Design a protein with these regions (language model features):
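Short, solvent-exposed loop/linker segments at the N-terminal edge
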Residues: 89-95, 189-195
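Contiguous beta-strand segments of beta-sheet-rich domains
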Residues: 11-15, 29-57, 111-116, 131-157, ...
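Extracellular/surface recognition and adhesion modules
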Residues: 1, 26, 34, 50, ...
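Extracellular acidic loop/turn motifs
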Residues: 4-10, 105-111, 206-211
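Terminal edge beta-strands and adjacent linker/stalk segments
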Residues: 53-80, 153-180
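Short strand-edge motifs at loop-to-beta-strand transitions and within beta-strands
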Residues: 19-21, 28-34, 70, 120-122, ...
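Surface-exposed, proline-enriched loop/turn segments that connect beta strands in immunoglobulin-like
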Residues: 16-18, 84-88, 118-119, 184-188
């Protein structure tokens, strides 16, 4: 803080950030040191503005604080925030797979929308670090099931300095639930002598490989 004339008595200057500066008698300047905003993962304003809220002392005839703010530009250090995907490790046929997207710090500004390879999206709300989506595992009558895989294809939103997606695939194994398949036989209701009878074998579920009926 700087005076245009030397102080007759100590001057106490109160700043808008809560700090105070003392200008000693006979002096025209005084200083105080404060910490710059701490590094974080969010986009910062880029500058710090402080004004004088009040000044007392000095024995001046008329002490008038300037309303012009003191401005300090703050260089933002870019930190990366990564969104990761996890999933249930196993599920039964017809069961529900839960996908969870996680980011390292609470979301600010706007929700983060995570797009998955299976076409679903997960929303991580403001103030949250996780969001979920569910999918149903297919249920069929065939033996064996391929694992269900999924991954993040993109992320948007939030107020992060650098938001990126961990696109490592996640996999969920599917446990067989035995389903009964019935094979039935039907025939032509009637036929003339010397004609042909048609026999039809019918499955209640589609065959995964050719079925020979004896």
């Amino acid at each position: 803080a700087t005076l245009t004339n030397p102080a007759g008595t100590p001057v106490t200057v109160t700043l808008s950030n809560g700090a105070t500066i003392t200008i000693d008698a006979g002096k025209t300047t005084g200083t105080v040191t404060v910490d710059a905003p701490k590094d974080d993962v969010y986009k910062d304003a880029g500058k710090v503005e402080v004004t004088i809220e009040g000044a007392t002392g000095g024995n001046f005839e008329n002490l008038v604080p300037s309303a012009v703010p003191a401005v300090t530009n703050v260089t933002d250090t870019i930190d990366t925030s990564t969104v990761k995907l996890s999933a249930d490790t196993s599920v039964a046929e017809g069961g529900t797979v839960t996908y969870t997207a996680t980011v390292g710090a609470p979301v600010t500004g706007s929700p983060v929308v995570v797009t998955l390879a299976n076409g679903q999206t997960i929303t991580i709300g403001v103030g949250q670090t996780t969001g979920t989506a569910t999918a149903v595992a297919a249920n069929d009558a065939l033996t064996g099931n391929a694992p269900i895989t999924n991954s993040i294809t993109g992320v948007t939103g939030g107020n992060f300095e650098d938001l990126v997606a961990d696109k490592t695939p996640v996999s969920t194994s599917v446990t067989d639930v035995p389903d009964t398949t019935t094979l039935s036989l039907s025939a032509s209701n009637s036929v003339a002598e010397g004609g042909q009878i048609t026999y039809t074998a019918t499955l209640t579920n589609a065959a995964g490989s050719p079925v020979t009926v004896t």
